């Protein structure tokens, strides 16, 4: 008999239907007969919030009144996905919702689909933050997520008639948004500019302007924990929204100028920073949300106290810096402690150092933020002074430890011209963690080697994870039911290591066939979704081969599309008959940063390869490429369960971790990948025989760099000696995918042949060889499905619950509320 332990609310379906009906009447102002699915979505969301409020308030009260240290997760991104279905699951209301909505005459999925996905993140960083706050609540750990409520998100991606990416505003707040509760009574004042003066022997910052940070609270219900934490996102408002005198002079635009300037801070995620104004806006954003969050935490944990004892602040809350975006919080807390509460430098430093911890998410030098000191001085003059003093203290400490002058110079936080935020975070906090074992080792050996040599105890690893509630239970209900059937319990949703119980079932033909049937049904569902949403005609009887992630050269979408072009070239030249090709559908999805030229060129190329190949009768439908636009959580939740083969082909030593690889493995996709990021740990756990490995290792990559690969044009040698590679690049260069225009992709081709920094060409042959092995394996359906079962069974380690437990043990030293 199957044991079901999922949360189940005491409310009945009839009661829930009455609550929805009541919300429609009193909140929406419509009857059930007048209502549309969007109205029912808003009403149902309001009803769910009512069921969460008591637990939310109790969680906050227990957090403030108890002795359990809280976590403040500071992140520029929270890629939450749709809220209603997740809240229903975690609150135990899914069945009641389905029956109630049906009784009211609506389709439950249509109501779920009426929700517009929040535009609060870009990629893995934001999705990780969302998984983590879900796990914190599910484990009963008191926590705040702190960030910004971006009015227009990152951007909405569209493609023009030439396949180019077009960025348009993401109007995710244009319709009624029932989950965020704005609280004007708990606003914070955030100031910028001005000067620092000395008054009575003390430094006093006299800002030039201020904005109002208003919190918008989102409930974060835990799964089966009875706890509801808070995601607090700040929106920027002006203190002088409207100048009536100016307006009455018919100077209408000037009358609202202060409002526009203030609200720009929370307009979009990652504004283009190629201009001085864009750089300034990014820094304003970062300071805006960390300043508001620090002041908010003091208000929360020391309510009504004018002179709180902030020496206990690190015992109340630990701030986790999710990448470098919130690092300006270190000098901000120093400023608050010294200038607002009168603490001396040493006491303030001790408090600050104990309060902050830093997660580094990259190995790419350009992603380790460096701010011009001139800009910091203009926007945050007091903070620049504090940073200079931190650097002086740091250098003195290094000298006392006997560190060589040359190394001290290399480790400088403040160089005179710039401020290195990763270095400030490393010195200013208690711990630094990487996000996969290989990444953490490379941080210690390469990226932050000098810091690791001097402060070895600061460094640790916490491998990333994903929440199984959203990415298995919600995304893949068929697989979820099969897992529960196979294990005889649903406890795996809160203890994912229980998936190991599926290992013996990989030898059970009946179970493996059921598993394959689940995958095929998911492929049919995705085919229908893609037709409905994008107009694509995807054949669910082909292999679904997926590469979805942010578009960046190091992730090497170029390698994947070159392999597709090479296969196409073989068909066109007659070397291979389309009749002999294993049918394959390649799905790309990715956004490129608006100013990232080569990434946008790659998107254009993929779209045009798709246009040409998909319409060429010589291919006979055996090779198809699709690029659904505007990749988001909804698309991921439809595509991941349908995927047979997942591409994780970044250059070794460049990907910090990745979480897409975990989601795919947990949903029964096999992985082709390099020894990079969390691929290393996935392969170790699922077994080398169940992972398609190719490509150079990180030491081999380093050795090739040492030979001058990217500076001496060595990539051209690979092009010249590999006929398949040459044919593929020549097709791009000769205009095959640009209506005969040889200039369209000349910059991309030039980069491949003369630089190729991320060694796409160097790994091409190994990649083509592994693809041949993949095809051979896929032609044996039972073997493939057994391998897929073992991937699921051995991927339980990659739960975000386990990640949070590691943070609790290694970094935060706290636990669930009592």
Q: Where in this protein do the model-derived segments appear?
A:
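A conserved ligand/cofactor-binding region detector
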Residues: 1-818
């Amino acid at each position: 008999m199957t044991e079901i332990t999922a949360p189940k609310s005491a409310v009945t379906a009839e009661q829930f239907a009455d609550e929805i009906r009541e919300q429609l009447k009193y909140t929406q102002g419509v009857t059930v007969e007048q209502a549309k699915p969007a109205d029912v979505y808003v009403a149902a969301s309001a009803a769910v919030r009512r069921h969460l409020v008591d637990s939310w308030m109790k969680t906050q009260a227990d957090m403030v009144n108890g002795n359990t240290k809280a976590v403040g997760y500071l992140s520029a991104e929270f890629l939450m996905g749709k809220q209603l279905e997740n809240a229903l699951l975690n609150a135990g209301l899914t069945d009641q919702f389905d029956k109630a909505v049906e009784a009211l005459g609506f389709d439950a999925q249509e109501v779920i689909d009426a929700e517009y996905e929040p535009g609060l993140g870009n990629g893995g960083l934001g999705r990780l933050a969302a998984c983590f706050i879900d796990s914190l609540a599910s484990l009963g750990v008191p926590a705040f997520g702190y960030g910004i409520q971006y009015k227009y998100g990152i951007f909405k991606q569209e493609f023009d008639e030439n396949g180019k990416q077009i960025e348009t505003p993401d109007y995710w707040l244009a319709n009624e948004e029932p989950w965020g509760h704005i609280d004007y009574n708990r606003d914070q004042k955030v100031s910028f500019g001005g000067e620092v003066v000395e008054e009575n022997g003390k430094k006093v910052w006299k800002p030039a302007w201020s904005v109002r940070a208003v919190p918008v609270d989102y409930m974060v219900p835990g799964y089966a924990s009875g706890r509801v934490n808070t995601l607090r996102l700040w929106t920027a408002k002006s203190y002088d929204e409207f100048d009536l005198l100016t307006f009455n002079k018919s100077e209408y635009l000037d009358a609202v100028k202060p409002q526009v300037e203030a609200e720009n801070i929370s307009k979009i995620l990652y504004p283009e920073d190629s201009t001085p104004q864009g750089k300034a806006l990014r820094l304003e954003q970062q300071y805006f949300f960390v300043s508001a969050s620090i002041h908010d935490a003091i208000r929360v944990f020391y309510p009504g106290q004018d002179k709180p004892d902030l020496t206990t602040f690190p015992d109340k809350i630990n701030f986790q810096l999710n990448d470098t975006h919130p690092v300006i919080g270190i000098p901000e807390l120093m400023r608050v402690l010294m200038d607002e509460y009168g603490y001396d430098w040493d006491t303030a430093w001790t408090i600050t150092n104990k309060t902050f911890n830093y997660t580094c998410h990259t190995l790419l030098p350009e992603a380790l933020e460096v701010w011009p000191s001139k800009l910091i001085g203009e926007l945050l003059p007091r903070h620049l002074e504090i940073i200079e003093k931190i650097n002086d203290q740091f250098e003195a400490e290094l000298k006392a430890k006997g560190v060589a002058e040359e190394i001290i110079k290399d480790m400088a936080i403040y160089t005179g011209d710039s401020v290195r935020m990763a270095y400030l975070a490393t010195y200013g906090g208690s711990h630094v963690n990487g996000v996969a074992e290989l990444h953490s080792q490379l941080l210690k050996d390469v990226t932050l080697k000098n810091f690791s040599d001097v402060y070895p105890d600061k460094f640790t690893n916490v491998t990333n994870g994903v929440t199984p509630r959203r990415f298995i239970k919600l995304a893949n209900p068929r697989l979820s039911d099969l897992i529960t059937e196979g294990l005889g319990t649903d406890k795996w949703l809160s203890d994912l290591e229980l998936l190991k119980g599926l290992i013996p079932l990989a030898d059970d033909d009946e179970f493996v066939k059921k598993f394959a049937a689940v995958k095929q049904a998911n492929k049919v569902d995705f085919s229908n979704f893609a037709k409905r949403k994008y107009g694509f005609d995807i054949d669910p009887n082909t292999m679904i081969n997926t590469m979805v992630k942010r578009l960046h050269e190091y992730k090497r979408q170029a390698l994947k599309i070159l392999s597709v072009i090479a296969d196409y070239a073989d068909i066109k030249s007659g070397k291979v008959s389309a009749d002999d090709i294993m049918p394959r559908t390649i799905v790309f999805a990715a956004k490129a940063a608006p100013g990232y030229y080569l990434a946008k060129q790659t998107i254009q190329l993929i779209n045009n390869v798709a246009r040409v190949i998909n319409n060429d009768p010589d291919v006979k439908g055996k090779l198809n490429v699709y690029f659904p636009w505007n990749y988001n959580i909804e698309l991921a939740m439809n595509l991941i369960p349908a995927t047979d083969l997942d591409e994780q082909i970044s250059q070794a030593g460049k990907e910090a971790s990745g979480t897409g690889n975990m989601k795919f493995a947990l949903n029964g996709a096999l992985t082709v990948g390099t020894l990079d990021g969390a691929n290393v740990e996935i392969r170790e756990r699922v077994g080398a025989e169940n992972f398609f490995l190719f490509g150079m290792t990180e030491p081999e990559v380093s050795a090739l760099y040492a030979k001058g690969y990217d500076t001496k044009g060595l990539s051209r040698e690979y092009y010249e000696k590999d006929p398949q590679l040459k044919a593929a690049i020549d097709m791009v260069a000769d205009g095959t995918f640009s209506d005969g225009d040889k200039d369209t992709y000349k910059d991309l081709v030039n980069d491949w042949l003369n630089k190729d920094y991320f060694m796409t060409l160097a790994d091409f042959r190994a990649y083509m060889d592994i693809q041949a092995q993949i095809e051979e394996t896929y032609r044996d359906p039972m073997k493939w499905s057994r391998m897929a079962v073992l991937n699921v069974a051995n991927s339980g380690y990659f739960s975000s619950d386990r990640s949070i437990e590691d943070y609790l043990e290694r970094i935060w030293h706290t636990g669930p509320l009592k």
